[in-house]
A protein has these predicted regions:
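Short glycine-rich or small-residue beta-strand-to-loop segments that form or flank ligand, phosphate
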Residues: 70-77, 232
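Short glycine- and acidic-rich boundary segments immediately preceding or forming the N-terminal edge
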Residues: 1-54, 158
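Glycine-/small-residue-rich active-site loops that bind phosphorylated ligands and cofactors
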Residues: 78-79, 236
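Active-site-adjacent mobile loop/cap segments within catalytic or ligand-binding domains
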Residues: 208-264
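Glycine-rich, often proline-containing surface loops adjacent to acidic residues and nearby aromatics
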Residues: 66-72, 226
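Short beta-strand-to-loop junctions in surface cap/lid or active-site-entrance loops
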Residues: 55-66
Length: 264
């Protein structure tokens, strides 16, 4: 079946509609009639609708186990356009394919750093001066929104998309806190890498290329794992989207299967 939402997102992006409103418009329209897709707006300190950060929530079909909860974040740096694009298309695919989304709940912020995005800057001057990292008392609005989100639900996995202009292929760095996650997600990434040429990944790296941004989460009973996916500038937006989807879907399936089997 043709995924018209995904097609609209791709066509609008190729036509130059890379701003947040243009990017998410097809998803927001689809959410009006969807049984699984919800669009929300996370409030900031101004409480103004125009300053709220948009997010999407996919609630997959009921399964005989607690849902696997995953948070996906893109656009942490305001001049990124490919990580938001990849997330938008990922959500469109999850909404369309009930088999992929069954037993999972996914919350996605395509453009977390809305302020920097609107100024087309990596970070704003204020964010550079005061810091823009979680759990370091940052006053940045997007940081506070994500911190609240990480305490709102007991997430199993946080996926952070970043653009790496120096990378020649998509790579991933993975921080696995729980022993069960080390087994389940480690095996899933190993299997994915065996079938995917040029995909590199590291578990709990001592000298990471990307600093993890969201974990460890303070004052929670169980830590989520964090996967940082670096998008290679050598790939086209379409190729990057395919890479992201392949990695995320492999991890979702592994977590869901493990929970269903009582191994998670």
């Amino acid at each position: 079946m043709l995924n018209t939402t995904d097609l609209l997102i791709a066509n609008r992006f190729e036509a130059g509609h890379t701003d947040i409103d243009g990017l998410i418009a097809p998803l927001a329209e689809r959410a009006q009639d969807s049984a699984s897709l919800i669009v929300g707006y996370a409030p900031t300190s101004t409480r103004l609708r125009e300053d709220a950060i948009p997010y999407f929530h996919i609630c997959g079909a009921y399964a005989e186990h607690p849902p696997v909860r995953v948070l996906i974040v893109g656009g942490w740096f305001g001049n990124e356009v490919r990580s938001p694009y990849a997330i938008a298309r990922l959500i469109a695919t999850l909404e369309m394919d009930e088999a992929l989304s069954a037993g999972v709940e996914v919350t996605a912020f395509p453009v977390a750093n809305l302020v920097a995005n609107r100024s087309n800057s990596y970070l704003t001057e204020e964010q550079i001066a005061t810091g823009a990292r979680c759990w370091e008392d940052s006053p940045a609005e997007h940081v506070k929104v994500i911190e609240r989100e990480l305490h709102r639900y007991p997430y199993d996995l946080v996926v952070f998309l970043r653009e790496n202009p120096r990378a020649l292929e998509t790579d991933a760095e993975v921080w696995l806190a729980e022993e069960s996650h080390k087994r389940v997600l480690g095996a899933a990434l190993k299997a994915y890498a065996a079938e995917t040429p040029n995909f590199r990944w590291k578990t709990n790296p001592t000298t990471p290329v990307y600093r993890r941004s969201f974990t460890p989460v303070p004052k929670v009973a169980r830590q989520p794992s964090e996967v940082v996916i670096g998008l290679s500038a050598a790939g086209s937006p379409s190729e990057q989207t395919t890479d992201v989807a392949g990695i995320v879907f492999a991890l979702l399936k592994a977590l869901r299967d493990a929970r269903q089997a009582g191994a998670l």
